[in-house]
Amino acid sequence: MLTMEPSFSAPGAIPPRRTPFLVYRDRIGAPSELAFLRRQYIGFTQLDPVWIGRVLLPQAPAVGARLLRLGGEGPLGALHRFLFRHCGIVPPIPVDGLAPVVHAQFARGGALALPLARALNAQLVVTLHGGDVGKEKNWSGTVLSRRWPAVIAATRHFVCVSNAVAEVAARRGVPAAKLTVLPIGVEVPDQPPPPLANPTYHLFVGRFVEKKGIAVIVDAVRRLRAEGDSTPVVFVGDGPLRPLLEALAKDVPGIELAGWLPPGAVKARMAGAWSLLVPSVIAANGDAEGLPSVIPEAMAQGCAAIGSAEGGIAEAIRHDVTGLLVPPGDAPALAGAMRRVGDPVVRNRLGLAGFRGAAADLNAGRQSAKLEALLLGG
């Protein structure tokens, strides 16, 4: 148990200083991670996250104000990072008064952060997101596979974003007593957005990779176009399957590849969409979803989500209540669900119920406060 003084302040007073603690993410600033990583800490009142990793990408400041590149930027920085990665030798950490806890993002992050936690005599907490524990290539000849038994032994809590992720972690040997299921919350407006009179498109947000069901969407869209349905589909993101979508855009009208957009622009796209498409599948390499953060994000904007009936997606979407579920990999079923939300009565009913569900169960402030309690020793 970490001992810290409770924080109280009178109205108008300067907020008390929070205690810094380290959050480890090896590559900080991947566009697909910015929103859900930041939201984990927005309700903290006693701890102040200091992000640390070996690589700081250009968009890293979007996750938090305090960023450290492991080893620094000086002439010895590359050597420090090499020794840390391969030998577990921890360079000096230029932060005073750190709380004795390290929060690592993703399973591999836990493996890399293990020597850091040991060097600081700090407790280790690891958040697992899905593919990080499910993808088979992560478990052969990697730093994760080599250090995993030690990570299990040293970690106080494995925080899982869904029950499905917790089940995979248990199969990887994590004791049930160390598993905590805590979905990442979402910032929900005080009032549900008013239904749009004429939303004009379906929406996908995420990386263009196999597990996101890109091929399923392509098949479904081709079926809809063959039936005369010309509703546009907007793809926000990027990735290795972009050529598949570029080919679709050449063949059929109404396909927009918007690239990565800032969080505010993504919210606006969600608020104006017929539906959010999340037809994820288990990839050939074992990569699978945990709980895609775009689902609660869409619900908070009153946007109906259409997702695969498996894993964390099926936990987040109540079929025909807060969204629609379809069998994984079933393009005809996805096309049917996309047609169904064309009915404004159905679309608005699902959108309102999704908003209420997100507000009740996935409020970012409450979920974040629960995480802080775990880090403090709860």
Name these PLM-found stretches.
Residues 164, 185:
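Carbohydrate-associated surface elements
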Residues 316-320, 324-331, 338-345:
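Conserved acidic donor-binding segment of nucleotide-sugar-dependent glycosyltransferases
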Residues 1-68:
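N-terminal subdomain of nucleotide-sugar transferases
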Residues 243-267, 275:
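Nucleotide-activated donor-binding/catalytic signature segment of Leloir-type glycosyltransferases, i.e.
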Residues 271-287, 303:
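Acidic donor-binding loop of glycosyltransferase active sites
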